[in-house]
């Protein structure tokens, strides 16, 4: 068996694209090999400057094969038959026929001769290279090929020999290159096979395997953290990213000047993790430590110089942050409200100052006399025009929290400002207390306004993430058990925009998102039966119905309802029942039970005790079964027939008070 080694050597590939490229090229090569009936073991490796493919167990030659290709029927127009022949470069005389389902079809037997594998590998490789689609790619120079970054070299060896491969301006060879910063005179590494390739890269400070680089980083982080008796929080995403920035990772320890530790910890984390790709350290009590860890791309003779350089870069960034922070705390959040007038919320919806005023009114509507909530609502966007958030946009809300605390506005106000953007996705936590009410108001105002502005999601896009916003609203209501009607809240919000025409569009949108939210736990028929925009009430109904309808009594009662509903469907019914017209015992008993339980069912619904309401409906099962078994509904006497139809109509209405049983 033979082996293939391919390396695409380029300028730096963005770290966040490397893992996808590794998996993508692996899948593409595997699939193309299988399509050509070449069954090989394929491995892929991605790094900052190279994508490598290694295939083993390759045959020397491909096996000859015959493939039967179905053509048109013999009765097809001559043009179709000629087209089939032309497509496969055969004459009509070379076609055979076969009977399929009493119809004769033309067939062509395509014969593939035995070929040496090295003859077809260049075709496969070029196809695979072109087939992978980078999220972004580029042309360079005056070359016609396109890739993520300029390609500098292609190494391609099959069984120790260079394959005759041409990709654009590049001709394949057996040359690899080591670490960019460890090369002497741009040293070329001649390789003969995969083991030789891997060893020579390692000798020249390149670790081929992404997973191995990640493991080296993890080990180095833990060792250095433990050496200072400090803790490091697990951050696999950052480890994966820095492994994509380094061909030969070395973990080093730097120190933070004491003066910067007065900054909020989120500022330190954002500066270090997001902007510098550094790892934060904490003491055993969870306090921010005066040290940080970073990954150097290579082991250098003077590690102290590398450390000092990184400390200097971090100090410069933190100096700016400290300056911005001191500038910001010199002003109150309220003093920044005027600046919000210069920030557009949406071209059709005004500015952020107007938005916070609407949000405050929605908060007043949902929670009367909650002073802390209204204060938080009016100030929740003020930090957006602060120096710090201008520099670190990911700290919106968080800086508002610290500024509110600095002003002495209290934890309730500060926490509501901090958490009012939550939840920002299905995995994000839902806020509680005043933060929940503020988050709800902010999201409702945004969603209603953007729907009015014509930004409703479509099949092709949702640029303002309104589907996610709606799910956030639904989660806030349900997880905080907020007893409010979303329909009323939508109407109130629309009034603040001076609009009422879009109510049906918005309520329908929320209903669809609520169905999407509930469908993981409940059957769609149950959801359709129970759903309204009092979502907490809907949840109670769903739980009760789900439990009730798995019982035999529940199933029988549902069947009885459906039978009654089918009988009255399409009938003109007054709904007025005259007990004096009853002539049979079953209808009398059914009427008496209905009258007895009806007020109790209504009371249970008011108390949101749907278990009790459904259990009360169960008392109808015996009399309604007897009614159907012994009473002719469509009596020859029209008055008696109408009276019995009205009785069934009233029973169905009683069921539908609990839930829309007609949808089950």
Swiss-Prot record:
Disulfide bonds: none annotated. The keyword Nucleotide-binding applies. InterPro entries: DALR_anticod-bd (IPR008909), Gly-tRNA-synth_bsu (IPR015944), Gly-tRNA-synth_heterodimer (IPR006194). The keyword Protein biosynthesis applies. Pfam families: DALR_1, tRNA_synt_2f. GO terms for molecular function: arginine-tRNA ligase activity; ATP binding; glycine-tRNA ligase activity. Its main location: cytoplasm. GO terms for cellular component: cytosol. It is found in: Cytoplasm. GO terms for biological process: arginyl-tRNA aminoacylation; glycyl-tRNA aminoacylation. It catalyses: tRNA(Gly) + glycine + ATP = glycyl-tRNA(Gly) + AMP + diphosphate. Its EC number is 6.1.1.14. Keywords: Aminoacyl-tRNA synthetase, ATP-binding, Cytoplasm, Ligase, Nucleotide-binding, Protein biosynthesis. PANTHER family: GLYCINE--TRNA LIGASE, CHLOROPLASTIC_MITOCHONDRIAL 2, GLYCYL-TRNA SYNTHETASE. Belongs to the class-II aminoacyl-tRNA synthetase family. NCBIfam families: glyS (TIGR00211). Tetramer of two alpha and two beta subunits. This is Glycine--tRNA ligase beta subunit. It comes from Rickettsia felis (strain ATCC VR-1525 / URRWXCal2).
């Amino acid at each position: 068996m033979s082996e293939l080694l391919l390396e695409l050597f380029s300028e730096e590939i963005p770290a966040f694209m490397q893992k996808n490229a590794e998996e993508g090229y692996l899948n593409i090569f595997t699939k193309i090999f299988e399509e050509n009936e070449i069954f090989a073991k394929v491995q892929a490796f991605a790094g900052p400057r190279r994508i490598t493919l290694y295939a083993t167990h390759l045959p020397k030659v491909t096996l000859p094969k015959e493939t039967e290709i179905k053509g048109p029927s013999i009765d097809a127009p001559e043009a179709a038959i000629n087209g089939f022949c032309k497509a496969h470069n055969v004459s009509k005389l070379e076609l055979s026929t076969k009977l399929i389902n009493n119809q004769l079809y033309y067939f062509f037997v395509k014969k593939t001769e035995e070929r040496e594998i090295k003859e077809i590998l260049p075709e496969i490789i070029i196809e695979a290279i072109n087939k992978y689609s980078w999220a972004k790619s580029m042309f360079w120079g005056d070359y016609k090929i396109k890739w993520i970054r300029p390609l500098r070299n292609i190494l391609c060896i099959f069984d120790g020999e260079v394959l005759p491969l041409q990709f654009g301006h590049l001709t394949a060879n057996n040359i690899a290159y080591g670490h960019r910063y460890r090369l002497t005179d741009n040293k070329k590494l001649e390789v003969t096979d995969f083991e030789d390739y891997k060893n020579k890269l390692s000798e020249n400070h390149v670790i081929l395997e992404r997973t191995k680089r990640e493991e080296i980083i993890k080990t180095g982080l833990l060792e250095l953290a433990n050496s200072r008796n400090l803790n490091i929080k697990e951050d696999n995403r950052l480890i994966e990213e820095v492994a994509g920035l380094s061909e030969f990772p070395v973990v080093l320890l730097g120190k933070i000047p004491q003066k910067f530790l007065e900054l909020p910890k989120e500022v330190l984390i954002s500066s270090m993790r997001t902007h510098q790709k550094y790892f934060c350290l904490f003491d055993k009590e969870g306090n921010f430590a005066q040290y940080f860890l970073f990954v150097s791309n290579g082991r250098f003779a003077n590690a102290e110089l590398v450390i000092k350089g990184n400390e200097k870069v971090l100090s410069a960034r933190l100096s700016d942050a400290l300056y911005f922070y001191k500038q910001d705390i010199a002003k109150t959040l309220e003093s920044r409200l005027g600046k919000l007038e210069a920030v557009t919320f949406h071209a059709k919806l005004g500015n952020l100052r107007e938005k916070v005023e609407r949000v405050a009114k929605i908060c007043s509507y949902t929670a009367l006399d909650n002073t802390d909530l209204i204060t938080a609502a009016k100030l929740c966007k003020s930090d957006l025009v602060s120096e710090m958030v201008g520099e670190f946009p990911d700290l919106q809300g968080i800086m508002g929290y610290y500024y509110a605390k600095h002003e002495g506005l209290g934890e309730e106000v500060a926490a509501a400002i901090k958490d009012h953007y939550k939840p920002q996705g299905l995995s994000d936590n839902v806020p509680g207390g005043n933060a929940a009410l503020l988050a709800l108001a902010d999201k409702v105002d945004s969603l209603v306004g953007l729907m009015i502005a014509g930004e409703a999601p479509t099949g092709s896009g949702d640029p303002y993430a309104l589907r996610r916003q709606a799910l956030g609203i639904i989660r806030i209501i349900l997880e905080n058990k907020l007893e409010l009607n979303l329909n009323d809240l939508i109407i109130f919000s629309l009034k603040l925009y001076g609009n009422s025409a879009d109510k049906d569009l918005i309520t329908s949108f929320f209903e669809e998102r609520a169905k999407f939210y509930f469908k993981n736990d409940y059957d769609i028929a149950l959801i359709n039966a129970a759903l309204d925009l009092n979502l907490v009430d809907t949840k109670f109904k769903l739980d009760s119905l789900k439990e009730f309808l798995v019982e035999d009594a529940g199933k029988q009662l549902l069947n009885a309802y459906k039978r009654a509903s089918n009988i009255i469907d399409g009938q003109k019914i007054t709904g007025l029942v005259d007990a004096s017209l009853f002539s049979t015992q079953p209808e009398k008993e059914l009427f008496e039970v209905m009258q007895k339980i009806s007020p109790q069912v209504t009371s249970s619904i008011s108390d949101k005790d749907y278990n009790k309401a459904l259990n009360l409906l169960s008392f109808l099962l015996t009399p309604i079964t007897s009614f159907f078994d012994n009473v002719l509904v469509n009596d020859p006497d029209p008055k008696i027939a109408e009276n019995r139809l009205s009785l069934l109509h009233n029973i169905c209405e009683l069921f539908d008070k609990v839930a829309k049983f007609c949808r089950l």
